């Protein structure tokens, strides 16, 4: 009987020790989850974009894919300061500098295409320069003309005008639907590292962050978070370029946080302790890293 009791006590001690050292103890302990707060930043309602008339012609250039193009917003504007990627007013500021586009579903990819860069050029209108303009996907064009072909760029007035000959930007914007050529290119944010903007709805039990300015692929396939003293745990794409993570233990998350990014092509980059222990909602934290 004494040996049996000793064996039972030894097993209990081993189980207790394993729970103490397991990463599950950080924030994934199986207990009743704390209700997740409703984030303050909601995905905007995506409406059809209406600055187009007419029908596209068809021209295909070797090495490039064909797409349609229109523009939305002000003629010299940034398209939208909301958008289905969550970049908000950043689209009109450096390094985006209004050179953006809303992508059709094949480009937006349910939000996974946010941040991807493309060269777009036109040759089918007298106002076209034939020189490509580089745009970043920052919004979704969900229906209407955006579903007419395999791909469609609803560009800001600024990026549409960038494809025009000098002095002919207004004429090009007035052309209606353009048939363009496009190709995926690496994003290049010279002198800018990846930034992490903490959502206003984040709190000690719930963390959500907008990730922007990734060189290379520009878009992300996966994001993992590591709490202080813990292991990596996958985050969940909330919408657009926002990723979320919440405690399932009823205990506050333990900052500082490190974030591990996996790009569309599988390249991995780690921003160690990029979110400090004293982090606050609504604040942007700039990392010291970017894809080379």
Swiss-Prot record:
Keyword Disulfide bond appears in the UniProt entry: yes
UniProt tissue specificity: Expressed in internodes.
Coarse class of the protein's main subcellular location: secreted
The record's listing under CDD domains reads:
DPBB_EXPB_N
Which is one Pfam family of this protein? Answer: DPBB_1
Q: Where in the cell is it found?
A: Secreted, Cell wall; Membrane
The protein's induction, as recorded, is: By gibberellin (GA3) and wounding.
Per UniProt, residues of the Expansin-like CBD domain are 205-287
Its membrane topology is listed as: Peripheral membrane protein
Domain of life the protein comes from = Eukaryota
User: What are the entry keywords?
Assistant: Cell wall, Cell wall biogenesis/degradation, Disulfide bond, Glycoprotein, Membrane, Secreted, Signal
Its name, as the record gives it, is: Expansin-B11
- Gene that encodes the chain: EXPB11
């Amino acid at each position: 009987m004494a040996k049996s009791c000793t064996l039972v006590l030894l097993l209990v001690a081993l189980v207790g020790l394993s729970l103490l050292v397991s990463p599950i103890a950080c924030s994934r302990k199986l207990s009743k989850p704390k209700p997740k707060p409703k984030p303050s930043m909601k995905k905007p309602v995506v409406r059809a974009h209406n600055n187009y008339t007419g029908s596209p012609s068809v021209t295909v250039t070797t090495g490039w894919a064909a797409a349609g193009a229109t523009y939305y917003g002000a003629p010299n504007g940034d398209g939208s300061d909301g958008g289905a990627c969550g970049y908000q007013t950043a689209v009109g500021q450096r390094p985006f500098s209004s050179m953006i586009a809303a992508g059709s579903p094949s480009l937006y990819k349910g939000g996974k295409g946010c941040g991807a860069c493309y060269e777009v050029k036109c040759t089918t209108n007298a106002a076209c320069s034939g020189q490509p303009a580089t745009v970043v996907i920052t919004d979704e064009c969900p229906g209407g003309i955006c579903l007419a072909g395999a791909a469609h760029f609803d560009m800001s007035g600024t990026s549409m005008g960038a494809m025009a000959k000098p002095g002919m930007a207004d004429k090009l914007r007035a052309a209606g639907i353009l048939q363009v050529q496009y190709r995926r290119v690496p994003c290049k944010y010279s002198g800018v590292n990846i930034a992490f903007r903490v959502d206003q709805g984040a709190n000690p039990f719930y963390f959500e962050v907008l990730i922007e300015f990734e060189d290379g692929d520009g878009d992300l396939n996966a994001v993992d978070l590591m709490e202080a003293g813990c292991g990596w745990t996958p985050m969940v794409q909330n919408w657009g370029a926002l990723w979320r993570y919440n405690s399932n233990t009823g205990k506050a998350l333990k900052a500082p946080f490190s974030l591990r990014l996996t790009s569309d092509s599988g390249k991995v980059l780690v921003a160690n302790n990029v979110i400090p222990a004293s982090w606050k909602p609504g604040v942007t934290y700039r990392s010291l890293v970017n894809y080379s």
